Amino acid sequence: MYEVFADLHVHIGRSENGKPIKITAARSLNFANIAKECAERKGINIVGIIDCASPYVIEDIENFLKTGDAYELKDGGIIYKDKVCILLGSEVETSEKGRNGKCGAAHNVCFFPHLKDIKAFSNEMSHHIKNITLSTQRSDISGYELIDIVEKYNGILIPAHIFTPFKSYYGNCTDRLENIFKEKYDKIFAVELGLSSDTFLADEISELENKTFVTNSDAHSLPKIAREYNKMQVEDISFKEVVKALKNEDGRKIIA
């Protein structure tokens, strides 16, 4: 076992050929530059890029794998220059029946082991999102429905920045996550706290007692990568090992 650093929430601003992905993110924030920044400047061992369901980004990933600097792992993830494991993710905005019956919106980060999985996920989600090429567009499904689609393609779902007043579960949808996910709540084994909260706040909520807390950068530019990150204890860097750490299985865990 050894300790690694993981930032599981990094956006893409533009595709390699300049097509917009996250409008509010920097143009320099593309797939290849994120991998390079983590490997050469930030010392991040595992990075979750959460705009990989965009067909433009999928094309970039396919080209990235042809460079010879990266390859897919059997246990999930893409290894770049034997230094960084890239997790292929998608941030999805769900439509929830919020407090007092009003409609609310919440963000979820979903991760998949292999490129084929997120390609299939992207294809299915294109029926629920008007513009699948852009980042975090609102879907017409709830978190309760989304988790089934994510699992269908071997993925995991983490409710994102759960306390943020704008577009989060506790922020504008519900007082209890269990009210959203119902009998599927046990399938949620980790939550992202977000930049506006910490473990002291989260520890006050009883339904989060057995959930793993993660904190990430939500980077919209290269310098913002790793402004917040997680320290994990794992056997190696892969999708499978990250899932074990999030579940606190077999000695894998989030240390800080």
Language-model regions, residue ranges each:
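Short acidic/histidine-rich active-site segments
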Residues: 211-227
